[in-house]
């Protein structure tokens, strides 16, 4: 397995690439890179979002290295440089979020704890934030965690959640869970143009990621499948059930995007208010991908990181 650089998006200095193996022998692309300061403050593990790939976070990893942290990142199964799940590798597919839990375990046990110094911190974005919250109710890897624009609940548009779940569950039960959800297509979202972009207002960083994907189309993932939606809603239920029954094993800072159009910010506030040790801050001018936003937004994000993690 390898990483893919472009002239304006170089891998972090000292990067090492790994193929982590899950218990069911899935290959998960992972990487680590050392701190750029004389003394290390620990390691930050980045958990990226649905359809993401490690290369999109090179810049943020460099920011963290310069602050004295080792960094680690990986791609979830079915996306980026990790092993795909279907014959059509472009489908954003998962059967259960327990599979994502296993990806994280494989990376932590097989890569991070063997190659990077503690204490360990985590930044989870969107779907990665959701999986991180799942992990924090079960595991004790991380001293502190930050989740950006977490997928605590979807915006369902005109469909009530119960109707969306019923239709997706029935479609999956009849053997069509591999099909794309209505309105979603095979090409990766990065190829759909920048106009009315719901993810970032930064055209330069968007174009940088488009170039990476144009040169390495194997990293791309298209729309999600019916099975993905079923698994996601079931994981929402599991997460909220745990919220009522127990706290998390690490303190968490939720960073929300003030101009969010993808996930449900109100659900994140409800989650935080019911869960001890969870704080919330909003970056008002940010769209969904906070770490890939314009310089002003990224400066605010890094200021929150510096204040919270140090």
Describe each model-derived feature in a short phrase.
Residues 54, 61-87:
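Conserved alpha/beta-hydrolase
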Residues 127, 132-220:
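Alpha/beta-hydrolase-fold enzymes
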Residues 278-310:
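Catalytic active-site module of serine/aspartate enzymes centered on a nucleophile-bearing elbow/loop
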Residues 250, 264-273:
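Short alpha-helix in the alpha/beta-hydrolase fold that links the catalytic acid
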Residues 92-112:
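Alpha/beta-hydrolase active-site loop
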Residues 248, 254-256, 260:
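Short beta-strand/loop motif that positions the catalytic acidic residue
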Residues 1-21, 26-36:
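An N-terminal hydrophobic leader/cap segment in hydrolases
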Residues 47-52:
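Active-site glycine-rich loops that stabilize anionic/oxyanionic intermediates
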């Amino acid at each position: 397995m390898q990483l893919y650089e472009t002239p304006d998006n170089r891998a972090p200095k000292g990067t090492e690439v790994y193929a982590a193996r899950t218990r069911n022998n899935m290959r998960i692309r992972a990487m680590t890179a050392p701190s750029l300061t004389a003394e290390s403050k620990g390691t930050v593990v980045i958990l990226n979002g649905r359809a993401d790939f490690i290369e999109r976070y090179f810049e943020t990893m460099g920011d963290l290295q310069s602050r004295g942290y080792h960094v680690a990142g990986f791609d979830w199964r079915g996306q980026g440089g990790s092993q795909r799940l279907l014959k059509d590798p472009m489908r954003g597919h998962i059967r259960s979020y327990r599979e994502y839990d296993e990806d994280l375990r494989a990376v932590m046990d097989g890569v991070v704890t063997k190659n990077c110094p503690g204490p360990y911190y985590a930044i989870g974005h969107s779907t990665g934030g959701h999986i991180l919250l799942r992990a924090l109710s079960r595991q004790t890897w991380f001293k502190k965690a930050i989740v950006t624009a977490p997928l605590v609940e979807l915006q369902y548009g005109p469909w009530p959640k119960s109707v969306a779940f019923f239709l997706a569950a029935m479609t999956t039960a009849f053997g069509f869970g591999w099909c794309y959800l209505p309105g979603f297509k095979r090409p990766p979202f990065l190829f759909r143009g920048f106009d009315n972009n719901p993810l970032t207002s930064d055209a330069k960083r968007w174009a940088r990621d488009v170039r990476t994907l144009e040169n390495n189309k194997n990293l791309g993932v298209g729309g999600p499948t019916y099975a993905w939606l079923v698994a996601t809603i079931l994981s929402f239920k599991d997460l909220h059930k745990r919220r009522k029954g127990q706290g998390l094993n690490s303190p968490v800072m939720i960073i929300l995007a003030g101009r969010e159009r993808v996930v449900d910010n109100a659900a994140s506030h409800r989650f935080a208010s019911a869960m001890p040790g969870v704080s919330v801050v909003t970056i008002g001018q940010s769209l969904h991908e906070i770490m890939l936003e314009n310089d002003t937004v990224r400066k605010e994000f890094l200021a929150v990181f510096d204040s919270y993690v140090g």
